[in-house]
Amino acid sequence: MSLPEVNPPPTFALELRPYQKQALGWMQGMEEAQPSSAQTTELHPLWEEYAFPLTDDVDCGVGTFYLNPYIGDLSLEFQPASRGARGGILADEMGLGKTVMLASLIHANRCMDAPQMQPRSSQRSGPLRQASLRFGKMPRIQRTQATLVVAPMSLLSQWRTELERASLPGTLSVDLYYGDVREQLAHKLSHGNTDVIITSYGTLTAEYKQHEKRGSSVLFSGTWHRVILDEAHTIKNRSTIAARAACRLQADRRWA
């Protein structure tokens, strides 16, 4: 089945190839998460169906149960394919321009209805605000219109370069969330003054540990418009801290 081609918005500076336009249309559909009637009767691909053993002395009232072996969950309820997930896995081969495709998606599906990031507590200024930074008390965020990109350290600059190259001047604000600039970016993000934040898996892991102890990480204190996990196979072992940190991120849309 041939997918329809979708043109990116005028803010996108590059010319997409036909297959990239098809990918953009597919990704937009995945983010809208409109289930078909067939999806509601299909078993979710991450779940497996099993039958209870038939014995005379055991009657549980149902004939089947469902297992998700990836997260270890059991359920007696049918798990349909359409469970409101927005996003997916962009599994094209290397060299086909996956970063450019995702850049076109960021431009096409911007968050228009969500409010800008708002601190949960009252704004502070002056010396008191600076003291809160030194003691690690970042603004606690409810919801953001920004996209969070998590990538290996070696790819952070490449992501920023590609996003800026794909955007007309002044149409997309891109920042690296790493090292000493994290405190300044936390407050820029809290005022809705950035569209894309790029960080590393190492920073994500460190902030996750900090958040578990003190609850003071911007990355985990609110809901992102979109989270993109680049090179997601690096966290395929779900028992690692990096994998747990990635799962802990709250987002309306997720891509890997």
Give the residues covered by each predicted segment.
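Conserved ASCE P-loop NTPase core motifs with emphasis on AAA+ ATPases
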Residues: 1-3
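ASCE P-loop NTPase motor core, strongest for the SF2 helicase catalytic module
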Residues: 5-256
